[in-house]
């Protein structure tokens, strides 16, 4: 079966009140257009055309090589939008899915089912319909006694009998491509809006004696359109629960799905536990038997097995196995932790590599550093990596011990097994197994407080 798709994505989305094209607003970490593109490709489509209008440059930049983009310069209706794809499909011999770019909940399985039924039935067109308890505001699908589609009637034009119909048009179609665009050119804008409606093509086909079929959708939420921020948030909830349920089926424990946020495409290993108010974003990959959260945000990170991360933020970092992070740690881009590393409370790490078994338990900043194995970094240690113009490297070799409240002024190296005395400001390299001390000598003045009071 040769199957192409046209995604109608030209609308401005006025009710979104945004400078961003509606189809580029995000759900579960991806623009809604991305979800639609993924669904049509997974349904077996071999060629995709996106019809852009408002914000066409942004839409084109996002689509890239994933599809061809054509421009609808004036928004004159859905039939007019589809007609803009004619140049890309003139000689296409197969079938065409038509979907809206603001239906990110539409499943690939639904589109595949529609296309398969359409091809097997021999119909010139097949609609995707849905049964709604309250169809108010929707166009009703009227069928013949044989079960074929007779026409679609808008609510304002429907008779009392037609108003009792609960089957509605979802705006998703499958057509035979040969002859489609000639039929589209017969549609006239004879309506209040002065637009070319794609629904009018059904009556054109029926009047020619051609068969139009319909497939009824099992879950009407799949075609829930998005026209404002309220509908966007509702769609986000539906999609988020799909993502979480898929993870749970795969063996992930999610303590509170209502308060857990995982982007589509995030990978999580089995027996990992995700606690409330945890955000897993971007291309994050989590191993098995981890405990994440509560209250953690992990963005574009690769995390191994058996790690514990609580109340912390990790961005573009790589974590080995058996690490403990937090509470209140901040791992910035370029951070790499080996196995069995401890990063404790109020620790910030940036563009640094921490070796096997090393510990940074609390109240420290580590930036542009390479730390070896089994290094202990005491509380209040600061790598002074920036002189106002350039960043410099700090190196702590295997087994080094850094006392509390130490300043390491880069570029500087502390050798293997070396010890830095607490309170030191280290500006020169410390050799292997040496003690580095760089602080003022303590002086005790006897009876000083008493003398101060006497002189005051």
Swiss-Prot record:
Repeat keyword on record: yes
Binding site for Mg(2+): 102, 227
Location, primary (coarse class): cytoplasm
Origin: domain of life: Bacteria
GO CC annotations on file: cytoplasm; membrane
Keywords: Acyltransferase, Cell shape, Cell wall biogenesis/degradation, Cytoplasm, Magnesium, Metal-binding, Multifunctional enzyme, Nucleotidyltransferase, Peptidoglycan synthesis, Repeat, Transferase
EC number: 2.7.7.23, 2.3.1.157
Any one GO molecular-function label of the UniProt entry: magnesium ion binding
Stretch list, region N-acetyltransferase: 251-456
Binding site for acetyl-CoA: 379, 385-386, 404, 422, 439
Localization per record: Cytoplasm
Keyword DNA damage among record annotations: no
Reactions mediated catalytically: alpha-D-glucosamine 1-phosphate + acetyl-CoA = N-acetyl-alpha-D-glucosamine 1-phosphate + CoA + H(+); N-acetyl-alpha-D-glucosamine 1-phosphate + UTP + H(+) = UDP-N-acetyl-alpha-D-glucosamine + diphosphate
Active site: residue positions: 362
Ligand binding (UDP-N-acetyl-alpha-D-glucosamine): 8-11, 22, 72, 77-78, 139, 154, 169, 227, 332, 350, 365, 376
Region described as Linker: spans on this chain: 230-250
Family affiliation: In the N-terminal section; belongs to the N-acetylglucosamine-1-phosphate uridyltransferase family. In the C-terminal section; belongs to the transferase hexapeptide repeat family.
HAMAP family: GlmU
NCBIfam families recorded: glmU, PRK14354.1
The protein's assembly and partners: Homotrimer.
Protein name stated in the entry: Bifunctional protein GlmU
Native organism: Desulforamulus reducens (strain ATCC BAA-1160 / DSM 100696 / MI-1)
């Amino acid at each position: 079966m040769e199957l192409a798709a046209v995604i109608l994505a030209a609308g401005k989305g006025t009710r979104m009140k945004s400078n961003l094209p509606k189809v580029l607003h995000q759900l579960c970490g991806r623009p809604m257009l991305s979800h639609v593109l993924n669904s049509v490709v997974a349904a077996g489509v071999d060629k995709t055309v996106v019809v852009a209008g408002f914000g066409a440059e942004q839409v084109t930049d996002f689509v890239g090589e994933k599809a061809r983009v054509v421009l609808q310069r004036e928004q004159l209706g859905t039939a007019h939008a589809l007609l803009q794809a004619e140049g890309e499909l003139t000689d296409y011999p197969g079938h065409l899915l038509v979907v809206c770019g603001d239906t990110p909940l539409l499943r690939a399985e639904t589109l595949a089912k529609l296309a398969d039924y359409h091809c097997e039935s021999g119909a010139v067109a097949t609609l995707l319909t849905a049964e709604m308890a309250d169809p108010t505001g929707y166009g009703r699908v009227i069928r013949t006694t044989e079960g074929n589609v007779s026409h679609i009637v808008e609510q304002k034009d429907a008779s009392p009998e037609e108003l009792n119909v609960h089957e509605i048009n979802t705006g998703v179609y499958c057509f035979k491509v040969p002859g489609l665009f000639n039929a589209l050119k017969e549609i006239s804008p004879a309506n209040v809006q002065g637009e070319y409606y794609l629904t009018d093509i059904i009556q054109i086909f029926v009047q020619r004696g051609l068969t139009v079929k319909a497939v009824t959708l099992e879950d009407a939420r799949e075609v829930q359109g998005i026209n404002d921020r309220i509908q966007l948030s509702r769609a986000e909830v539906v999609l988020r629960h799909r993502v979480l349920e898929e993870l749970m089926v795969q063996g992930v424990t999610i303590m509170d799905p209502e308060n857990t946020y995982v982007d589509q495409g995030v990978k999580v290993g089995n027996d990992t536990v995700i606690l409330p108010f945890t955000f897993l974003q971007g291309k994050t990959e989590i191993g098995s038997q981890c405990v994440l959260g509560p209250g953690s945000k992990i963005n574009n990170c690769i995390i191994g097995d058996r790690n514990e991360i609580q109340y912390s933020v990790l961005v573009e970092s790589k974590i080995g196995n058996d690490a403990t992070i937090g509470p209140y740690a901040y791992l910035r881009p370029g951070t790499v932790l080996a196995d069995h590393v401890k990063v404790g409370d109020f620790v910030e790490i940036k563009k640094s590599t921490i070796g096997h078994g090393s510990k940074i338990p609390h109240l420290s900043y580590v930036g542009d550093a390479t730390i070896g194995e089994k290094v202990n970094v005491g509380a209040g240690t600061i790598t002074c990596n920036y002189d106002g113009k350039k960043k410099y490297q700090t190196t702590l070799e295997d087994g080094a011990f850094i006392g509390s409240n130490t300043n390491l002024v880069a570029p500087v190296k502390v050798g293997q097994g070396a010890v830095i005395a607490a309170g030191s400001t280290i500006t020169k390299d410390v050799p292997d197994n040496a003690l580095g001390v760089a602080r003022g000598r303590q002086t005790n003045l006897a009876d000083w407080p008493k003398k101060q009071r006497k002189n005051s």
